[in-house]
Regions:
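AlphaC helix of the eukaryotic protein kinase fold
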Residues: 87-119
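Activation segment signature within eukaryotic-like protein kinase domains
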Residues: 170-171
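Conserved short submotifs of the Hanks-type protein kinase catalytic core
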Residues: 136-150, 154
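Protein kinase catalytic-loop region centered on the HRD/HxD motif
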Residues: 174-186
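Conserved end of the kinase activation segment
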Residues: 234-245
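Conserved activation segment of eukaryotic-like protein kinases, specifically the C-terminal portion
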Residues: 221-235
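Activation-segment/catalytic-loop signature of the eukaryotic protein kinase fold
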Residues: 131-132
Length: 269
C-alpha cells in the first residue's frame, strides 16, 4: 500500500505509475528548496505530501495522519524573508543571525496561536487544529483538511464579486463565528478574502489566524503586519490597542469587497 502525495489516496497497486483518484503521477517531482520533500514524516506520525500553497510566513502541505488514517493539512512556520532550508532538506535556518530573536518570537507566537485556536474546537466556523509541535527548527500545525475554495478564489471565478444573498450569508456566518471566538478572548487579526474558506458542502470557516505575522515582519521599526484595505487604523501602530472591533472593521471591508468587486480603501486614507 502506498500513498499518492498529491491527494493522499491509498493505492493498493504498488506498480501503479499514476493515481487512480486524482490522475497525477506517482513518480517523485522536483520541489523548490523551501518545501519539504513529499513523504517526510513529522511528529512521528504525520506524512507531508506536496505543498498546497505558501505565503510570506509559511508553507501548507496536504498530509496524512498515520494513526487516525485520514487526510490533514500541515502548516509550517516559514517566514521566507529571512530563513531557508538546511542541507538536510528538513531544518529551517535563519539566514541572518541578527534576526534570530525575531524569528524565535514569531515561532513562539505561531505555537501560542495554534494553542488558542485548538481550544476553539467546538466552534463550527473555525478550522479545527488537532496537533501542533516544534521540529526541524520550526513549528507545525496539524489541521483538518478542507475541500472547497477560499473567498478570494471564489471571487476570481465569479467576475470579481458575488450577489447580495450569497455575500450576506457568508458575512453573517463570519460574524456569528467571531462572536464565539471573541468570547474566548481570541482575535483573528487577518480577516480577508483569502482567510475565509467555503467548503464543498457550503460550510464557512475562518482559517489562518494572524497573530504570528505581527512579529515576523522584516521592518524592525514596527512589529505589525497588515493587509491594506482590511486592516483598521489600530493595526498600523504597535502602540494602538486592538480588540473585537479590529476584526469587525475587516468584516465590513470584506462585505464591501464581495458586493462591489473593488478593493476597500486603506484605513490611513
Amino acid at each position: 500500500m502506498k500513498l499518492c502525495y498529491h491527494c493522499m489516496s491509498q493505492i493498493s497497486n504498488d506498480k501503479a505509475s499514476t493515481c487512480p483518484v486524482c490522475g497525477k503521477s506517482l513518480d517523485p517531482e522536483e520541489q523548490k528548496p523551501r518545501f519539504l520533500k513529499p513523504g517526510t514524516v513529522l511528529g512521528g506520525k504525520f506524512i507531508a505530501g506536496y505543498h498546497l500553497g505558501s505565503g510570506g510566513f509559511g508553507n501548507t502541505y496536504i498530509g496524512w495522519d498515520q494513526v487516525l488514517q485520514r487526510k490533514v493539512a500541515i502548516k509550517e512556520f516559514y517566514p521566507e524573508q529571512y530563513c531557508g532550508r538546511g542541507q538536510d532538506g528538513l531544518t529551517v535556518v535563519v539566514t541572518d543571525e541578527r534576526l534570530i530573536s525575531r524569528y524565535q518570537r514569531g515561532l513562539q507566537q505561531f505555537l501560542v496561536e495554534a494553542r488558542n485556536v485548538a481550544a476553539l474546537h467546538d466552534v463550527q466556523g473555525v478550522v479545527e487544529i488537532s496537533n501542533f509541535f516544534e521540529e526541524n527548527g520550526t513549528g507545525y500545525i496539524i489541521m483538518e483538511y478542507l475541500e472547497g475554495m477560499d473567498v478570494k478564489t471564489i471571487l476570481k471565478k465569479s467576475g470579481n464579486k458575488k450577489d447580495y444573498e450569497w455575500s450576506r450569508r457568508v458575512i453573517l456566518t463570519v460574524l456569528y463565528t467571531l462572536k464565539e471566538v471573541h468570547k474566548r478572548g481570541v482575535l483573528h487579526r487577518d480577516i480577508a478574502p483569502d482567510n475565509i474558506f467555503v467548503t464543498k458542502e457550503g460550510i464557512v470557516k475562518l482559517i489562518d489566524f494572524g497573530a504570528a505575522k505581527n512579529v515576523t515582519v522584516m521592518d524592525s521599526s514596527k512589529d505589525v503586519w497588515l493587509k491594506s484595505g482590511y486592516a483598521p487604523i489600530e493595526q498600523y501602530r504597535n502602540t494602538f490597542e486592538q480588540g473585537p472591533y479590529t476584526d469587525l472593521y475587516a468584516v465590513a471591508a470584506l462585505f464591501y469587497r464581495m458586493l462591489t468587486g473593488q478593493k476597500p480603501i486603506p484605513a490611513v486614507d
